[in-house]
């Protein structure tokens, strides 16, 4: 995968040199290029200006971003604009992006964008209903969530397919050594070695956590007969 990032602050992306994303780059599975579009600004070096019609704040000008975009070697990239008004980013969208060969992220850092910039864009994306100073943190979040889904980036596919949201449910509780820590012991079923009982326990706990913390996820989750029976039991146990 090739990722190009248009930003005024390329130094903010230093964390992408490490952990899973850094390893993906070392393996040759990922290429990331940074483009400081201030370098594409005209002689004034100004990348922003006051909006026509008045109003508070500044807008990013179209010219520096268009020129930076034109300088990128590309075929048919997915072009993502980080914008609070965009579609909310989620796991399903990360899985969608992980199938792409080229991604371009446009990160703003002022009041907004000249509307004409959006003619370059295929996707307008937001992390949620809140405002960040710029798009850099949002872009890093999306890149991390996406890159870890690329085949061969993580050793075992189960490492991410069992994650919360990948299955449609929140992840079940997990434990490691020691068995007893400050009086808190590991559930006996996990010590039993009985794989079917462990599977059922994990599924039950996953359903319970989702029901109690994120019931909205269950609206779109297609349940098996076994899961429906478990959920009914969970509802009854927590009906008070």
UniProtKB/Swiss-Prot annotation:
Keywords carried by this UniProt record: Cytoplasm, Methyltransferase, S-adenosyl-L-methionine, Transferase, tRNA processing
GO CC list: cytosol
Signal peptide: none
Domain of life, per lineage: Bacteria
InterPro entries in UniProt: Alpha/beta_knot_MTases, tRNA_m1G_MeTrfase_C_sf, tRNA_m1G_MeTrfase_TrmD, tRNA_m1G_MTases_N, tRNA_MeTrfase_TRMD/TRM10
Coiled coil: none
EC number: 2.1.1.228
Localisation: Cytoplasm
Family under the similarity heading: Belongs to the RNA methyltransferase TrmD family.
UniProt protein name: tRNA (guanine-N(1)-)-methyltransferase
Organism of derivation: Streptococcus sanguinis (strain SK36)
Gene designation: trmD
């Amino acid at each position: 995968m090739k990722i190009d990032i248009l930003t005024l602050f390329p130094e903010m992306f230093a964390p992408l040199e490490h952990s899973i994303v850094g390893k993906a780059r070392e393996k040759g599975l990922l290429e990331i290029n940074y483009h400081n579009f201030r370098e594409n600004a005209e002689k004034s070096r100004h990348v922003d200006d006051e909006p026509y019609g008045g109003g508070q704040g500044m807008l990013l000008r179209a010219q520096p971003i268009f020129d930076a975009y034109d300088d990128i070697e590309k075929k048919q990239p997915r072009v993502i604009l980080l914008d609070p008004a965009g579609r909310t980013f989620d796991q399903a969208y990360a899985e969608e992006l992980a199938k792409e060969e080229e991604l371009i992220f446009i990160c703003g850092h002022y009041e907004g964008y000249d509307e004409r910039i959006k003619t370059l864009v295929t996707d307008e994306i937001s992390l949620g209903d809140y405002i960040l100073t710029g798009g850099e943190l949002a872009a890093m979040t999306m890149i991390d969530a996406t890159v870890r889904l690329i085949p061969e980036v993580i050793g075992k596919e189960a490492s991410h397919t069992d994650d919360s949201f990948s299955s449609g449910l929140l992840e079940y509780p997990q434990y490691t050594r020691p068995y007893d820590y400050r009086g808190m012991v590991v559930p006996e079923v996990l010590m039993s070695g009985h794989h079917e009982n462990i599977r059922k326990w994990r599924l039950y706990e996953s359903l319970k956590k989702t029901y109690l913390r994120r019931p909205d996820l269950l609206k779109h989750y297609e349940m098996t007969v076994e899961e429906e029976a478990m959920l009914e039991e969970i509802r009854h146990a927590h009906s008070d």
